[in-house]
Regions:
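Structural microenvironment flanking redox-active thiols in thiol-disulfide oxidoreductases
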Residues: 72-116, 124-131
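Active-site acidic short loop of glycosyltransferases
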Residues: 55-57, 87, 118
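Short active-site neighborhood of thiol/selenol oxidoreductases, capturing the structured segment around
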Residues: 48-72, 78, 92-95
Length: 134
């Protein structure tokens, strides 16, 4: 009986394939339009940047907040990429999206930008006008 059961199971079981087929996560073509970067509460480390000015460029937009431990772990890497790849055309924009009221003052964002020595423009997004469309 065990042999008959085994044979029956083998007949109904789909063959197992060890071949891996990779699928793209997203379309390789750029999206049609970058959401607006307006609506922040000021800019640190430079003048306001518009989506139109970034058209055709390789852009990394880093959403972070200064009191987030995960953000604190990634900021040095983003900073290093900004420095390392700037000459090759990478543009980094920081969007500070506060979680708590004490993270909202522009002076707090400026202190964090100085502490982490961020060389790229950062816009505080206290009302989530910038981050929401993303």
């Amino acid at each position: 009986i065990a042999e008959q059961l085994e044979n029956a199971l083998l007949r109904i079981r789909k063959p197992y394939s060890t071949q891996v087929k990779l699928q793209p996560v997203a379309d390789a073509t750029p999206s049609s339009q970058l959401p607006s970067l307006s609506g922040g509460t000021g800019w640190v480390n430079g003048d306001p940047v518009t989506s139109e000015a970034l058209r055709g460029k390789v852009v990394l937009i880093d959403f972070w907040t200064w009191d987030c431990i995960n953000c604190q772990h990634t900021l040095p890497h983003v900073r290093d990429w900004a420095k390392k790849y700037e000459s090759q055309g990478l543009v980094v924009i920081g969007v500070h999206t506060p979680e708590y009221p004490w993270e909202k003052p522009l002076s707090s964002v400026k202190n964090a930008v100085n502490k982490w020595q961020l060389p790229y423009p950062v816009v505080p997004d206290n009302n989530y006008n910038i981050s929401s469309p993303f």
